[in-house]
Each structure stands twice: as structure tokens, then as C-alpha cells.
Amino acid sequence: MDKVLNREESMELMDLLGLERAAWGNLPLMRKAYLRKCKEFHPDKGGDEDKMKRMNTLYKKMEQDVKVAHQPDFGTWSSSEVCADFPLCPDTLYCKEWPICSKKPSVHCPCMLCQLRLRHLNRKFLRKEPLVWIDCYCIDCFTQWFGLDLTEETLQWWVQIIGETPFRDLKL
């Protein structure tokens, strides 16, 4: 995510979206803020045309570069389809056993917490550069990117974002 826009552009986009810079990388939150600001900045609604153009340029560039950073499309999945199939409930798909899965991933555990952590370990072994949030969706990259401790509340935030993320982008 840190390679999508340069630092100045990312800070400008977050300011235009009215979000804290710490929220950079929370794509569902950024999308909601973008749609809200489109209504506010729209010239037909009495908004600032220059801000609207600049926000559109930066957001579309960020959105396009995130798509390019992910795997090529091999089907069309929307986040609403994934969320409908799997409810946002950490004790089912996302985290099978909270205290155990949070400490060490198991190859035998089917939950996303363990599977994404194992995927992170495999990819980390094969790459020279470090993995970061959006390049990797594991909870460790999430906590490191946002500067959070690994708690049940953090798990809930991570689950919310993973639930809104298209499955193909998780690179499982």
C-alpha cells in the first residue's frame, strides 16, 4: 500500500477524504469517505470543483494501483457476495479459537487468521523485501501497519476489513 501513491499524494488524499492518516490502507473506510466527499464536493451541489477533481484523480490512481498490485482477475467476486456467504463472526471463518490461533498459526486450522499468517510466512521466505498491509492481509501486517496491539478488539477490526475485502485479493 505504501507504493501506491507517493507520500505527499497519500497525505493529500487522506486530507481530502477527511480521514486520519493512520487510516491509510483501510480501503472500505476510504471508499465510504470517498463516496461521502463526492456528494460534498460535487459542483452541482455547491461544492468545490477543484477539490472534487483532485480527489477523483488521487482516488482513481490509488484504486487502479491497488488493483494492479493484486493478482490478475480470474473471476468476478464482489465483497458483498463473500460477506453474504460468510457472516462476520470471528468464531467461524475468521478465527476458530481466539487465544490459540492468535499465538501460533496451525496448518491444520482452516480459519483465515491461521491461513493468512501461514501464507505470510511462506511469502516472507520467498521474498527479499518485507511484506506490508494490502500486500499481505494477515493480522500481523494489520497490527504492524496500524500500530495496534493484538487484542480481541483488534481482531474485530481486522475481521471487519477482511469481510469487506474481495476473496481473490487475500491471495490464499
Curated annotation (Swiss-Prot):
The strain Dunlop sequence is shown. The common region of ST and LT proteins comprises the J domain. This domain is essential for multiple viral activities, including virion assembly, viral DNA replication, transformation and transcriptional activation. This domain is also required for cyclin A-transactivating activity of ST. GO terms for cellular component: host cell cytoplasm; host cell nucleus. InterPro entries: DnaJ_domain (IPR001623), J_dom_sf (IPR036869), Papo_T_antigen (IPR003354), Papo_T_antigensf (IPR036092). Pfam families: Papo_T_antigen (PF02380). It comes from the Viruses. It comes from BK polyomavirus. This is Small t antigen. Residues 12-75 form the J domain. Keywords: Acetylation, Activator, Early protein, Host cytoplasm, Host nucleus, Host-virus interaction, Metal-binding, Oncogene, Phosphoprotein, Transcription, Transcription regulation, Zinc, Zinc-finger. A zinc finger (C4-type) spans 101-114. The modification N-acetylmethionine is found at residue 1. Promotes efficient viral genome replication by accelerating both G1 and S phase progression of the cell cycle. Inhibits host PP2A by binding to the A subunit, thereby displacing lower affinity regulatory B subunit. Inactivation of PP2A in turn results in the transactivation of cyclin A and cyclin D1 promoters. Late during the infection cycle, ST may induce dephosphorylation of host MTOR, leading to the inhibition of cap-dependent translation. May establish and maintain high levels of viral genomes during persistent infection in cell culture. Interacts with host PPP2R1A; the interaction inhibits PP2A activity.
